[in-house]
Amino acid sequence: MGLCYTCRMASVLLCLSTSKYNSRVIEKGAQIAKNNHATLSAVYVQTPKDESMSAASKSCLRENIKFAESKGAKVTILYGHNKIRQIVEYVDVSQVDCVVIEKSLASQALFRLRDIDVYSVNYPHDYRRLFYFDFSSFR
């Protein structure tokens, strides 16, 4: 199953992480936004655990933020104890139409988000997948 490029949406949200594979989330989200003439934003949720983050993870996060900004995303840093709860609340407040997120977070989000379209895309040379959430059906 591939991404739905025919869906019309006004805004796309990228979920940033410290993963070296997060660039794939950014690329796909930017492509979806471009195809739909949608605004692009990105969010990273900082938790208390992030204080003990390794230097390599911090570096990867900085690179992912810079990459998202280079694709035209407005980056927002949120603070909280639960990444998924913060993302879901941000989506509700911001009226985001589409969220592009890594599988590790998406599997947790599915328990909180109902009646959404989920599309997956394989990472190149990797078993992981991306998930695409279309929130336009909520309005």
Language model: regions and residue ranges:
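A short acidic, amphipathic alpha-helical/loop segment
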Residues: 27-29, 87-90, 108-112
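Residue-level detector of structured alpha->beta connecting loops
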Residues: 37, 72, 95, 115-117
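Structural beta-alpha unit
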Residues: 1-5, 71-99, 105-106, 127, ...
